[in-house]
Amino acid sequence: MLSPKRTKYRKHHRGRMKGKATRGNKIVFGDFALQALEPAWITSRQIEAGRRAMTRYARRGGKLWIRIFPDKPVTMRPAESRMGSGKGSPEYWVAVVKPGKILYEMKGVSEIIARAAMRIASYKMPIKTNFLVKSTSPN
Protein backbone atom coordinates (compact mmCIF):
# COMPACT_ATOMS: atom_id res chain seq x y z
CA MET A 1 0.00 0.00 0.00
CA LEU A 2 1.10 3.55 -0.70
CA SER A 3 1.86 5.90 2.18
CA PRO A 4 4.32 8.74 2.83
CA LYS A 5 7.72 7.81 4.27
CA ARG A 6 7.55 10.74 6.68
CA THR A 7 5.31 13.75 7.23
CA LYS A 8 5.66 17.10 8.94
CA TYR A 9 2.52 16.53 11.04
CA ARG A 10 0.93 13.26 12.18
CA LYS A 11 -2.68 14.44 11.95
CA HIS A 12 -4.47 16.60 9.38
CA HIS A 13 -7.71 18.56 9.27
CA ARG A 14 -10.42 16.96 7.17
CA GLY A 15 -10.78 19.92 4.81
CA ARG A 16 -13.24 20.42 1.97
CA MET A 17 -13.25 19.27 -1.66
CA LYS A 18 -14.40 22.37 -3.51
CA GLY A 19 -14.24 22.91 -7.25
CA LYS A 20 -12.49 20.96 -9.98
CA ALA A 21 -8.91 19.71 -10.25
CA THR A 22 -6.66 22.41 -11.70
CA ARG A 23 -3.55 20.21 -11.66
CA GLY A 24 -3.12 16.61 -12.73
CA ASN A 25 -6.09 16.85 -15.10
CA LYS A 26 -4.23 16.22 -18.37
CA ILE A 27 -2.68 13.05 -19.80
CA VAL A 28 1.10 13.44 -19.45
CA PHE A 29 2.81 10.02 -19.44
CA GLY A 30 0.60 7.48 -21.21
CA ASP A 31 -1.86 7.27 -24.10
CA PHE A 32 -4.94 6.24 -22.11
CA ALA A 33 -6.20 7.49 -18.74
CA LEU A 34 -8.85 7.02 -16.08
CA GLN A 35 -10.30 10.35 -14.94
CA ALA A 36 -12.37 11.07 -11.81
CA LEU A 37 -15.78 12.67 -12.35
CA GLU A 38 -16.70 13.16 -8.67
CA PRO A 39 -14.91 14.44 -5.55
CA ALA A 40 -13.84 11.78 -3.03
CA TRP A 41 -11.20 10.44 -0.69
CA ILE A 42 -9.57 7.42 -2.33
CA THR A 43 -7.78 5.15 0.13
CA SER A 44 -4.40 3.54 -0.48
CA ARG A 45 -6.15 0.14 -0.52
CA GLN A 46 -8.47 1.25 -3.33
CA ILE A 47 -5.53 2.65 -5.34
CA GLU A 48 -3.66 -0.64 -4.90
CA ALA A 49 -6.73 -2.72 -5.82
CA GLY A 50 -7.13 -0.73 -9.04
CA ARG A 51 -3.44 -1.07 -9.87
CA ARG A 52 -3.51 -4.85 -9.32
CA ALA A 53 -6.64 -5.28 -11.44
CA MET A 54 -5.12 -3.34 -14.35
CA THR A 55 -1.71 -5.05 -14.27
CA ARG A 56 -3.33 -8.50 -14.06
CA TYR A 57 -5.60 -7.77 -17.01
CA ALA A 58 -2.78 -6.32 -19.13
CA ARG A 59 -0.58 -9.35 -18.26
CA ARG A 60 2.70 -7.42 -17.87
CA GLY A 61 2.08 -5.67 -21.17
CA GLY A 62 2.56 -1.92 -21.38
CA LYS A 63 3.33 0.54 -18.61
CA LEU A 64 1.08 1.91 -15.87
CA TRP A 65 1.38 5.22 -14.01
CA ILE A 66 -0.48 6.02 -10.79
CA ARG A 67 -1.13 9.77 -10.84
CA ILE A 68 -2.51 10.11 -7.29
CA PHE A 69 -0.77 9.58 -3.96
CA PRO A 70 -2.39 9.09 -0.53
CA ASP A 71 -0.76 11.83 1.54
CA LYS A 72 -3.61 12.62 3.96
CA PRO A 73 -3.91 10.62 7.21
CA VAL A 74 -7.41 9.73 8.39
CA THR A 75 -7.75 9.36 12.15
CA MET A 76 -10.25 7.15 13.98
CA ARG A 77 -11.31 6.90 17.59
CA PRO A 78 -11.67 3.50 19.26
CA ALA A 79 -15.20 2.07 19.21
CA GLU A 80 -17.43 3.05 22.16
CA SER A 81 -14.95 5.61 23.49
CA ARG A 82 -16.30 8.67 25.30
CA MET A 83 -16.16 12.16 23.84
CA GLY A 84 -13.11 14.27 24.53
CA SER A 85 -9.57 13.13 25.30
CA GLY A 86 -8.17 14.31 21.97
CA LYS A 87 -8.16 13.28 18.35
CA GLY A 88 -7.88 9.61 17.38
CA SER A 89 -4.78 7.96 15.99
CA PRO A 90 -4.08 7.78 12.23
CA GLU A 91 -5.60 4.60 10.78
CA TYR A 92 -5.16 4.84 7.00
CA TRP A 93 -4.09 7.19 4.20
CA VAL A 94 -6.23 8.81 1.52
CA ALA A 95 -5.69 10.80 -1.67
CA VAL A 96 -7.97 13.82 -2.03
CA VAL A 97 -9.43 13.59 -5.54
CA LYS A 98 -11.44 16.33 -7.23
CA PRO A 99 -13.44 16.06 -10.48
CA GLY A 100 -11.16 16.03 -13.52
CA LYS A 101 -8.16 14.46 -11.76
CA ILE A 102 -6.33 11.72 -13.68
CA LEU A 103 -6.07 8.57 -11.52
CA TYR A 104 -4.16 6.15 -13.78
CA GLU A 105 -2.41 6.31 -17.14
CA MET A 106 -1.45 3.46 -19.47
CA LYS A 107 0.81 3.05 -22.49
CA GLY A 108 2.07 0.21 -24.67
CA VAL A 109 -1.24 -1.67 -24.97
CA SER A 110 -4.11 -1.50 -27.45
CA GLU A 111 -7.09 0.74 -26.74
CA ILE A 112 -9.37 -2.28 -26.30
CA ILE A 113 -7.15 -3.78 -23.58
CA ALA A 114 -6.62 -0.40 -21.90
CA ARG A 115 -10.37 0.32 -21.90
CA ALA A 116 -11.20 -3.10 -20.43
CA ALA A 117 -8.43 -2.87 -17.80
CA MET A 118 -9.55 0.60 -16.73
CA ARG A 119 -13.18 -0.51 -16.56
CA ILE A 120 -12.15 -3.23 -14.08
CA ALA A 121 -10.15 -0.64 -12.10
CA SER A 122 -13.12 1.76 -12.14
CA TYR A 123 -15.21 -0.84 -10.29
CA LYS A 124 -12.67 -0.67 -7.45
CA MET A 125 -13.08 3.11 -7.16
CA PRO A 126 -15.75 4.75 -4.95
CA ILE A 127 -16.54 7.33 -7.67
CA LYS A 128 -17.71 7.63 -11.27
CA THR A 129 -14.83 7.69 -13.74
CA ASN A 130 -14.20 8.41 -17.40
CA PHE A 131 -11.88 6.74 -19.93
CA LEU A 132 -9.70 9.18 -21.89
CA VAL A 133 -7.53 8.79 -24.97
CA LYS A 134 -4.62 11.21 -25.41
CA SER A 135 -5.66 12.43 -28.87
CA THR A 136 -9.22 13.26 -27.74
CA SER A 137 -8.37 14.78 -24.35
CA PRO A 138 -8.54 18.60 -24.16
CA ASN A 139 -5.22 20.47 -24.02
From Swiss-Prot:
GO terms for cellular component: chloroplast; mitochondrial large ribosomal subunit. It holds the Pfam family Ribosomal_L16. It is found in: Plastid, Chloroplast. Residues 1-20 are annotated as: Disordered. GO terms for molecular function: rRNA binding; structural constituent of ribosome. The keyword Protein biosynthesis does not apply. GO terms for biological process: mitochondrial translation. Keywords: Chloroplast, Plastid, Ribonucleoprotein, Ribosomal protein. Part of the 50S ribosomal subunit. Belongs to the universal ribosomal protein uL16 family. NCBIfam families: rplP_bact. This is Large ribosomal subunit protein uL16c.
